[in-house]
Curated annotation (Swiss-Prot):
EC number: 2.7.1.-
Residues engaged in binding ATP: 79-81
Protein name: Probable ketoamine kinase TTHA1179
Organism: Thermus thermophilus (strain ATCC 27634 / DSM 579 / HB8)
Domain of life, per lineage: Bacteria
Origin organism lineage: Bacteria, Thermotogati, Deinococcota, Deinococci, Thermales
Amino acid sequence: MDPLALLRKAGLEAEGPALPLHGGDISRVWRVGRFVVKTAQDPPPGLFRAEARGLQALAERGVRVPRVHWVGEEGLVLAYLEPGPEDWEGLARTLAALHRRREGSYLAEPGFLGTFPLPGREGGEWTAFFYERCVLPLLEATWDRLQGLGPKVEALYQRPLPAEGPAPLHGDLWHGNVYFAREGPALLDPSFFVGERGVDLAMMRLFGGFPRRFWEVYGELYPVPEEVERALPRYQVYYLLAHVHFFGQGYLGALWRAISAS
């Protein structure tokens, strides 16, 4: 949908032209004055509502995110955050505080990783929760493209994953979903659920982009136990299956390396 038409549907007044912004592989994104408008070509039902719920969940837990002005099946209208200087130490403080929070139980509403639908799930033992809610749907979707790696992926989760306690997660925390606003570090495009912080740490490590100073400050504020470090490749398998699904078999090498390191 045209961004100006979406603003009209939302009952919001455009304050200037629609200027394209980088929107990644899923959405088309524009700045229109004080608003950011996101749309997508034939989005799966519930995509933008899930994003809005995730932003609200992070905001309720003290994370800076763009305010949601309107959400519908066609798109999402957010507040535009003025850019500011990089503040990796501030980001480390934000994420350490988020990951230190303890929730009542593991919990995921039906949602998405990118545009891939994920089921809801609540409670239970962590390894089963993570495997059945996150890994298994992607494993089933990519099985025929894994060149025999499927059984090796299954075997990874027959050993328990370490459990520090249920914590709120961004859920898709690569460096492109970090935004340094004038007011301080902000997070974008969450795939929010309550799980173990190793999931976020694994995605941050997978594609890099987080400098040494970030990791130093995060580690000072919330040290990462050795058993969590050792589990990161098993969490990375989740994201690499998603990359095989979206982008093809070029990611099988990285998937094999994560399996081998597990």
